[in-house]
Amino acid sequence: MAKEPARVKRRERKNITSGVAHVNASFNNTMVTITDAQGNTISWSSAGLMGFKGSRKSTPYAAQMAAEDAGRKAAEHGVRTLEVNVSGPGSGRESALRALQAVGMTITTIRDVTPIPHNGCRPPKRRRV
C-alpha cells in the first residue's frame, strides 16, 4: 500500500505592524531574530544560514545579508517598524542596522543590551599571532 504524502503545514501570515529586532553579533557569527512585542519569533536569519562558512561568517557583509533576509521575511508578515536590541562585540553590528533600514523598516529605537560582567568569569587568554 502506497504511503499518503505528508501534509506540509503552511506558515500563516501574521499581521503585525511593529516588532523587535534582536541582533546578536558574536565574534564568530551574526544572528538576527525579529519578534513581536511579547517575544514570539516572526523571522530569523544568521550569517551561517546565508551560506557563509568559517571566518567569513564574522564579516560585516555576512551580517548585512542575514539582516536583509530576516527583514524581508518579517515584511511578509506585515512588520513595518522595529525596535532594535544589539548585543555582542562582533563586527556586524552597524551593517545589520543599515541593512534593516535598507529593506524598508522604520527603526524607532536602538538599544545596546550587551551583557557586561561586574568582574565575573575570567576572559579567554590573549591571542598571540
From Swiss-Prot:
GO biological process: translation
Pfam families to which the protein is assigned, alphabetical: Ribosomal_S11
GO cellular component, one term: ribonucleoprotein complex
GO MF terms, alphabetically ordered: rRNA binding; structural constituent of ribosome
The keyword Heme belongs to this UniProt entry's keyword annotation: no
Listed InterPro entries: Ribosomal_uS11, Ribosomal_uS11_bac-type, Ribosomal_uS11_CS, Ribosomal_uS11_sf
Alphabetical keyword list: Ribonucleoprotein, Ribosomal protein, RNA-binding, rRNA-binding
Subunit structure, interactors included: Part of the 30S ribosomal subunit. Interacts with proteins S7 and S18. Binds to IF-3.
Cited function: Located on the platform of the 30S subunit, it bridges several disparate RNA helices of the 16S rRNA. Forms part of the Shine-Dalgarno cleft in the 70S ribosome.
Protein family: Belongs to the universal ribosomal protein uS11 family.
UniProt name for this protein: Small ribosomal subunit protein uS11
